[in-house]
């Protein structure tokens, strides 16, 4: 699991926008992708792509248009806080 965590942390930390999306969902909770875009000041199409990439890695999930961190995503958010 440590290798997986390091790999996922590299994926998130390698892109400031991904890092910001994780932080916002962690601090503000579940929200629509357009709201994530507004809060992070990242263009909506970019946010949608970021969320899709993160969903492929089971870091976020979507239900009825509302996105939130999964258990794995919450662990990554905690690790980001430690490393931050």
Where are the model-predicted features located?
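Short, amphipathic alpha-helical interaction segments positioned at domain boundaries
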Residues: 74-84
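Short amphipathic alpha-helical interaction segments
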Residues: 42-55
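Short alpha-helical segments that sit at the start of domains
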Residues: 1-21
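Minor-groove-contacting beta-hairpin "wing" of winged helix-turn-helix DNA-binding domains
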Residues: 65-72
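Residues within the helices of the helix-turn-helix
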Residues: 23, 34, 65
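Short helix-capping/hinge SLiMs at alpha-helix to coil transitions
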Residues: 25-28, 57
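A short, conserved structural fragment
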Residues: 55-65
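Short acidic, hydrophobic short linear motifs in intrinsically disordered regions
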Residues: 30-39
